[in-house]
Swiss-Prot record:
Pathway linked to the protein: Carbohydrate degradation; glycolysis; pyruvate from D-glyceraldehyde 3-phosphate: step 4/5
Membrane spanning stretches: none
Name used for this protein in its record: Enolase
Top-level EC class as recorded in UniProt: lyase
Cofactor(s) demanded: Mg(2+)
Species this chain originates from: Desulfatibacillum aliphaticivorans
Chain's gene name: eno
GO cellular component terms given for this protein: cell surface; extracellular region; phosphopyruvate hydratase complex
BP term (GO), one: glycolytic process
Reactions catalysed: (2R)-2-phosphoglycerate = phosphoenolpyruvate + H2O
EC number(s) from the headed UniProt entry: 4.2.1.11
Length: 428
């Protein structure tokens, strides 16, 4: 029933108009699984390799024809006849065939597309929704969304150094209510920005990309939007940021060009400390550069009462993450499927986080598609948090809509907790 019968890959476009890989996996029962691979803009240097046709003129060298060819001509013959329900075996076969540490032979985009499509095909063969197939009866926690409503850094053409300014509707009782609260704040933010004479064009992840004078001005606009929407900041809605500090770390200094500041590691932590004292910030992602391990240790000691999320520093890699655990760096990990390049390795990283008390945030990438795999994954592993952009652009909203459907499907079995009650209670 779940024996793999056919594997087909193609080149499609992502939300930035760049090519990406889409894969279909068919089983002997007629089941089909389809998956599209996302792509990042601010990327960790140790991420699995996204194979692109750099020497070709097609798509300005960004094509993925070679990755597609690798699926159709190398991976397909390798896994046809295997059991789609044996995810680990399928993934291991591809990893062995690739044989490189960063998946540079076949391409992480080729391997991941097949990996995710295989899981979907198996779920379809058994007649289960994806979240149920991946998580069994235990997967029933809807994740609290971290909504990126102002974009800066590599995600927008403005002078904001911080890449993402996010709201977290921690006062919501359901996923549907969380989405509504976020949408209401987003709508009010648009009105506030318009009134202030700012552009309301959106960035890669659907958030507004105004050319504000300082990072703090972004916080002020968001606080005003929360109030205008009828909510209380710190109680109903809290704040989070993704600094993506590797992008503005130059020769060991943190260059906040928008504010004309050049800061040492300690001064950068001081900067965050000041912002935390002024605003209900409960989570900071990539507050320091990926190579600043000593700085991360200092930041964890000083700011460890809030959530400190490692993205570029951990890159969803179990071995690198284990190093961070041993050093006591951060207290949370951002999980991006394409950073490591297979579902099996992603699940290993999530399991490691749970065993060592790190929180888990399932995340999209800035270059996305309509694929909603991460919504099902977040519920399946009871991650408790998801980061999938703003309340605009179909590539972002598709994930929120899928969470609403899953919540409806779970019915009374659905739960919706928040990992931030303890943090915000201590700030009252």
């Amino acid at each position: 029933m779940t024996q793999i019968l056919e594997v087909t890959a193609r080149e499609i476009l992502d939300s930035r108009g760049n090519p990406t890989v889409e894969v279909d996996v068919y089983t002997e029962s007629g089941a089909i699984g389809r998956a599209a691979v996302p792509s990042g803009a601010s990327t960790g240097t140790r991420e699995a390799l996204e194979l692109r046709d750099k020497k070709s003129k097609r798509y300005g060298g960004k094509g993925v024809a070679q990755a597609v060819k690798n699926v159709n001509e190398i991976i397909a013959p390798l896994i046809i006849g295997m059991d789609a329900a044996d995810q680990a075996a399928v993934d291991l076969a591809m990893l062995d065939e690739d044989g490189t540490e960063n998946k540079s032979k076949l391409g992480a985009n080729a391997i991941l597309g097949v990996s995710l499509a295989t899981a979907r095909a198996a779920a379809d063969a058994f007649g289960f929704p994806l979240y149920r197939y991946l998580g069994g009866v235990a997967g029933q926690t809807l994740p609290l969304p971290m909504m990126n409503i102002i974009n800066g850094g590599e995600h927008a053409a403005n002078n904001l150094d911080i890449q993402e300014f996010m709201i977290i509707p921690k006062g919501a009782k359901t996923a549907a209510e969380a989405v509504r609260m976020g949408a209401e704040v987003f709508a009010n933010l648009k009105a506030i920005l318009k009134k202030g004479g700012h552009a309301t064009a959106v960035g890669d992840e659907g958030g507004f990309a105004p050319d504000l004078d300082t990072n703090e001005e972004a916080f002020k606009c968001i606080m005003d939007a929360i109030k205008a929407a009828g909510y209380k900041a710190g109680k109903d809605i809290v704040l989070a940021i993704d600094a993506a500090a590797s992008e503005f770390c130059v020769k060991g200094k943190y260059e906040l060009k928008g504010e004309g500041k050049s800061l040492t590691t300690t001064q950068m932590i001081d900067y965050y400390e000041e912002m935390i004292s002024k605003y209900p910030i409960v989570s900071i992602e990539d507050g320091l550069a990926e190579g600043d391990w000593d700085g991360w240790g200092e930041m964890t000691q000083r700011l460890g009462s809030i959530q400190l999320v490692g993205d570029d520093i951990f890159v969803t890699n179990p071995s690198i993450f284990r190093k961070g655990i041993e050093k006591g760096v951060g207290n949370s990990i951002l999980v991006k499927l394409n950073q490591i390049g297979s579902l099996t390795e992603t699940l290993q990283t999530i399991d490691l986080a749970k065993r060592y008390g790190y929180t888990t945030v399932i995340s999209h990438r800035s270059g996305e598609t309509e694929d909603t795999f991460i919504s099902d994954l977040a519920v399946a592993v009871n991650a408790g948090q998801i980061k999938t952009g703003s309340l605009s652009r179909t590539d972002r909203v598709a994930k929120y809509n899928q969470l609403i459907r899953i919540e409806e499907d779970l019915g009374r079995a659905a739960s919706f907790g928040t990992p931030f009650d303890k943090i915000t209670d201590s700030k009252k």
